[in-house]
């Protein structure tokens, strides 16, 4: 009852409004009289006389501007009071607007006394021409309007036969009548009583929700049946495996006592381990008494996963796409950006995704090669929050792929726009996250990294990280990872030296943050900047060693090891010769082979299609289908079976997405095929000089190029560089491992520089994003930030912070390096 009383006035007002709209005059009088007698207040509704009078005033103003030929006043009122959904979505409104533009373009020609003012006429014609090139372009394929596209270019339209009807006396009054009818229709629609609107919207909304829920239920039931079958099979296999394991343990105990295992028993055990389809045939066709037969058959029973024959996606009409991205409504732009991103993120890794990306690049989808003032890239500064966010998501998706980064890097304005958006965006957290993610991946390319340092991005990052509790997990992790990447460069360290106290305080505070995913990046940044003498002095003055030792007491073994080497760096004196030479040359900027598509790219979608509205791939293939021009592009592949050991150090800046997926996404590098073949066979060998030259240039000779990029750069003899400062003498995968010379000893504390380098090897030739960090080193003459590749395709990454410590303890094929 309390709720009714609270809203009684509004409810009674809705009833009164509806009775008035439906012309129940007697009922309305009785209703109003009874409300007055009972003392019930009647709320004045939006649909009252005030709204009617306002609507009439607007109509009169529009008609007056039409009669006077006042183009600016008319279209200002038109855009202010006619909703964009009607202007852009209603075909009659679009056609009427086209003819209205013609009316104002020829107004002076029709109604001027004497010769019209040339300057004013040129201005009106120019306005019409601009309309034809922008919003009016949507009607260019309509036969009815096609002749009028030549109107701005005809010297004297009054005598031209194509435009004869425009200058007839009846044309303007007929157009005016259409305008008045349209305005009356719009006014009536806007005067629909609120009670009726609520009823319609509620019923339609419930119907749509019910339909969606039903579809979801059917899909969920289908999946649950599939999963139940898989679960039952896995459970049966598990019980069978436990039973066989128990018997094998008993048999092993029996052999210790001297009892022999019979061939028949061995055969029965092996058959039980195979799938049902193979059991009967194997029982009679395979001799398990031969040594090695049983184990070989068991391994062979694990059938290799057959690669699906994934079809290429249909080609698109990119000219039409780009035109609508620039000139379409904000809602259409958002749906197109979403569909283009989905095509990239949901495509199958491999040929399908590569073909999609190559089509985008070859058609210059983002206008990176264009110098036009109006380009797709400008959507990053759209007034629409949704368009701005979806543009940032698409750029982040491009930046997640090596070829995409190369494409974006062609236009220097892209980096400037992203940096500007990062610093200005304060409304939309997801937009800011995607811009930050793209910039973090941009730091894989050295020229872009240099530009970011010069633009003062380090100062912005440090300022943001002063209050990490206000940041999302994604923003925190990518900010720290980007800061670490920039701190690996000499110029980056020099920037940090300008605000050494603040940088050290921020990093020391982050050491104790609850998000453990950021620890490797914080440690890497600390170790790197402490190679600068002035920063070491500042750190000693603020008692950094005591702060670090507090974390030694609380941290795990891996964290303790990292901090111990940071302390050794803190207490070290001048570094050996060669360490201080600049690493800021731009001569090596190759592409890396692994690409990561994060799950975050498609999270929390802002727009959903209404009933009958197209979206995603259906929108692209229905409205923008092009000529079939897709061709597969052979792509370099990473090294198979190369992983990182928990005993290996963080060797290069890496990608947060790749870090969690179990393989490094590292700095941009290419690999010759010969090295890849040897690496796959598990025999690291010395890299031939010819191959090394090709590798340095990043020019693979075959599509199957794959290798641990740790072989790419050879450190100078006797040179010691801390992780974050140097190149690892990477054992090249084409020969026997190199034998390192004895590392020089650090004069400050008696620790060999080789030992220090073993904990931090991080100077990248081209830094990468922070997803594959590890800190325990191989013993080598001079450790380096060396990328390691896996041949597995990109996988969905979890949100930063959701898998704490997933970066640690990864098995490695590098543990044999000595």
Curated annotation (Swiss-Prot):
Compositional bias (Low complexity): 701-711
Primary location recorded for the protein, binned into one broad class: cytoplasm
Tissue expression from the record: Strongly expressed in most melanomas and melanocytes. Weakly expressed in the testis.
SMART domains according to UniProt: LisH (SM00667)
Domain LisH: 7-39
UniProt region (Disordered), positions on chain: 642-755, 790-818
Positions in coiled-coil regions: 204-230
Keyword Membrane: no
Biased composition (Polar residues): 792-818
Subunit structure and binding partners: Interacts with TOGARAM1, CCDC66, CEP104, CSPP1 and CEP290. Interacts with NDUFAF2.
Protein name, per record: LisH domain-containing protein ARMC9
Top-level taxonomy: Eukaryota, Metazoa, Chordata, Craniata, Vertebrata
Gene: ARMC9
